[in-house]
Amino acid sequence: MGNPETNAGNTGSSIEASVGEGGALEERRKMRIKGFIALLTDPSLDSRWKAAEALGLEGDASAVEPLINALKDPYVDVQWLAAKSLGQLGDTRALEPLIEALKSEDKWLRTGAAWGLGKLQDYRAIDPLIPLLKDKKKLVRKTAAWALGRIGDERAGAALTETLSDEAGEVRDAAQKALDAIKNKKTGKNPDAASQI
């Protein structure tokens, strides 16, 4: 069985070692995030879009402002991934920049911004998202419907109901799922319904 005092000493050393390793892991994670943030301004397009995507997966709030700046990158590859990553981070500092990005001429940035707003689930995005249900690009319309369902406010109900007659089946399906999510949220049947869209 061993000497309890010796075993206690070993346990303490193990805990200290674990804490030390955890601190080292956290330090490496912070360095990795700083590296990705630096890559957002790299001359290489591939480096910038990969960094924008990685920062969303890292989930660190220190990336919010750099990703907001990346919404203005000259290439849409970076812009739309920055928008998606901002949604993944879930920080409301991204709300206004994402709403502004909905006005872009590029369908990919509008799509990424709508997706990001859906992930944020902030009621202030409802009115800016509704016009996208009539966007000329079906991917934008579909993503806007999805986002409105995720937000789950009945103020979007009339516009989503109108979208049930969209020419594209996938847009109609997204609108129906969004309406179901709003209904379920209101009745309390399935509070997570919006996340299943």
Language model region names:
Residues 127, 135-146, 150:
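Strongly charged, low-complexity linkers/loops
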Residues 23-27, 54, 85, 116-119, ...:
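Core register positions within helices of long alpha-helical scaffolds
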Residues 6, 27-41, 58-72, 91-103, ...:
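Amphipathic alpha-helical scaffolding segments comprising HEAT/armadillo-like alpha-solenoid repeats
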